[in-house]
């Protein structure tokens, strides 16, 4: 028995090999799991559920096929696909979750999220995020013609790329204190997230009883982005593992 977590797949028409390998994952590894959690940035961009491009219908069909096999797929929005709505969720069979969710899984108490909210030192991004997640702004954006939405999204991605080149590594990574605060707030022993593209499992020393100097070791598991290989976090009764798997091309000639 296992539960799988993935994120930062960044599906796009421009990167067909990533799509092919994602479909392979859904048809193989994912079918052996009890459930699948996608922790944001499933797509490289998302300008609305009403985008009629066949690419999105194909992805939705593959995800829905997993549901038909009796395997639930849960989704937390990322910074690139936070506009995914209930319409696409219904089409794909995904179950939308809030941006931060605590789950009891086997013997673990885990907080799952995309991870961008932990990068609190990146104040420019956090300001943008607050604006972009405002319901009025989102409704206004979704009222625009698709072509104009596509133009805005492309321009924002270019601007973000240029800004990120000027930011230090520390600013773009999670803030350690924000991690501690989140774990203490939800009383969890594990955090699983993506966003930073810095895969690892970190040990975190937490003070349980300040007066007695009582401490415990918590852990933070970070997913990798899907570029030249895929990654997942596999949770079983025995362990929580970060697993990488190489992309394969020859298997997908018929996909």
UniProtKB/Swiss-Prot annotation:
Lineage: Bacteria, Pseudomonadati, Pseudomonadota, Gammaproteobacteria, Enterobacterales
EC number: 3.6.1.54
Record-stated family: Belongs to the LpxH family.
Role of this protein: Hydrolyzes the pyrophosphate bond of UDP-2,3-diacylglucosamine to yield 2,3-diacylglucosamine 1-phosphate (lipid X) and UMP by catalyzing the attack of water at the alpha-P atom. Involved in the biosynthesis of lipid A, a phosphorylated glycolipid that anchors the lipopolysaccharide to the outer membrane of the cell.
Biological process, per Gene Ontology: lipid A biosynthetic process
Enzyme class, spelled out: hydrolase
Keyword Iron-sulfur on entry: no
Co-factor remark: Binds 2 Mn(2+) ions per subunit in a binuclear metal center.
Coiled coil: none
Record's protein name: UDP-2,3-diacylglucosamine hydrolase
Family annotation (PANTHER family): UDP-2,3-DIACYLGLUCOSAMINE HYDROLASE, UDP-2,3-DIACYLGLUCOSAMINE HYDROLASE-RELATED
CDD domains membership: MPP_YbbF-LpxH
Keyword Hydrolase: yes
Membrane topology recorded in Swiss-Prot or TrEMBL: Peripheral membrane protein
Gene name linked to the record: lpxH
Reported cofactor(s): Mn(2+)
Pathway: Glycolipid biosynthesis; lipid IV(A) biosynthesis; lipid IV(A) from (3R)-3-hydroxytetradecanoyl-[acyl-carrier-protein] and UDP-N-acetyl-alpha-D-glucosamine: step 4/6
Subcellular location, record wording: Cell inner membrane
Predominant location: membrane
GO MF, any single term: manganese ion binding
Annotated substrate binding sites: 79-80, 122, 160, 164, 167, 195
Binding-site residues for Mn(2+) 2, renumbered to this chain: 41, 79, 114, 195
Annotated Pfam families: Metallophos
Gene Ontology CC annotation, any one: extrinsic component of plasma membrane
Reactions catalysed according to its record: UDP-2-N,3-O-bis[(3R)-3-hydroxytetradecanoyl]-alpha-D-glucosamine + H2O = 2-N,3-O-bis[(3R)-3-hydroxytetradecanoyl]-alpha-D-glucosaminyl 1-phosphate + UMP + 2 H(+)
Keywords, in A-Z order: Cell inner membrane, Cell membrane, Hydrolase, Lipid A biosynthesis, Lipid biosynthesis, Lipid metabolism, Manganese, Membrane, Metal-binding
């Amino acid at each position: 028995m296992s539960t799988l977590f993935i994120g930062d797949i960044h599906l796009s028409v421009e990167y067909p090999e990533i799509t092919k390998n994602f479909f392979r994952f859904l048809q193989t590894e994912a079918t052996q799991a009890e459930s699948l959690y996608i922790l944001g940035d499933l797509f490289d961009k998302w300008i609305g559920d009403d985008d009629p491009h066949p690419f999105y219908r194909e992805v939705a069909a593959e995800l829905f096929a997993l549901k038909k096999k009796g395997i639930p797929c849960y989704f937390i929005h990322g910074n690139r696909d936070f506009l995914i709505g209930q319409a696409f969720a219904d089409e794909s069979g995904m179950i939308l979750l809030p941006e931060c969710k605590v789950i009891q899984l086997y013997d673990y108490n885990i907080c799952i999220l995309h991870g961008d909210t932990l990068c609190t030192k990146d104040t420019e991004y956090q300001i943008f995020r607050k604006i972009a997640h405002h319901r009025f702004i989102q409704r206004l954006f979704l009222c625009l013609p698709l072509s104009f939405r596509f133009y805005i999204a492309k321009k924002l991605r270019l601007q973000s790329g240029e800004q990120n080149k000027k930011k230090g590594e520390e600013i773009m990574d999670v803030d350690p204190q924000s991690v501690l605060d989140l774990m203490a707030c939800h009383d969890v022993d594990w955090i699983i997230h993506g966003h930073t593209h810095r895969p690892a499992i970190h040990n975190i020393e937490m003070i349980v009883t300040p007066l007695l100097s009582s401490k415990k070791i918590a852990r933070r598991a970070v997913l990798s982005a899907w570029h030249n290989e895929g990654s997942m976090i596999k949770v079983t009764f025995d362990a929580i593992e970060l697993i990488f798997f190489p992309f394969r091309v020859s298997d997908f000639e018929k996909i």
